């Protein structure tokens, strides 16, 4: 059976692995997922990510990040725009998750950006996910 929302699958794998205190999590590779992982790394939510060759296709391995006492750096992660209901926002109406404590990942014509980068550039786009 084909997967209808591979981005939601990625976010769920990250959420579950973080809750279970796993060191790494593997998932099928795509450029879009690698771009999301790049944003999460840049914002300090994960340690690192690598693309590995598998028997069939490529695998994206994400190394999760925890605090000194084992607290999760990803407290929550939520898919916003879904295949059945796409969510878009203009640059002046971009959401600020948890009053600015989290990030919104936005798919724009300039690639994937956070809401702060979109505000700086004055562009809007599709709201992919919230991370806090």
Swiss-Prot record:
<dbReference type="GO" id="GO:0003735">
    <property type="term" value="F:structural constituent of ribosome"/>
</dbReference>
<keyword id="KW-0687">Ribonucleoprotein</keyword>
<protein>
    <recommendedName>
        <fullName>Small ribosomal subunit protein uS8</fullName>
    </recommendedName>
</protein>
<keyword id="KW-0699">rRNA-binding</keyword>
<comment type="subunit">
    <text>Part of the 30S ribosomal subunit. Contacts proteins S5 and S12.</text>
</comment>
<dbReference type="InterPro" id="IPR035987">
    <property type="entry name" value="Ribosomal_uS8_sf"/>
</dbReference>
<dbReference type="GO" id="GO:0019843">
    <property type="term" value="F:rRNA binding"/>
</dbReference>
<dbReference type="InterPro" id="IPR000630">
    <property type="entry name" value="Ribosomal_uS8"/>
</dbReference>
<dbReference type="Pfam" id="PF00410">
    <property type="entry name" value="Ribosomal_S8"/>
</dbReference>
<dbReference type="GO" id="GO:0006412">
    <property type="term" value="P:translation"/>
</dbReference>
<keyword id="KW-0689">Ribosomal protein</keyword>
<dbReference type="GO" id="GO:0005840">
    <property type="term" value="C:ribosome"/>
</dbReference>
<keyword id="KW-0694">RNA-binding</keyword>
<dbReference type="GO" id="GO:1990904">
    <property type="term" value="C:ribonucleoprotein complex"/>
</dbReference>
<comment type="similarity">
    <text>Belongs to the universal ribosomal protein uS8 family.</text>
</comment>
<comment type="function">
    <text>One of the primary rRNA binding proteins, it binds directly to 16S rRNA central domain where it helps coordinate assembly of the platform of the 30S subunit.</text>
</comment>
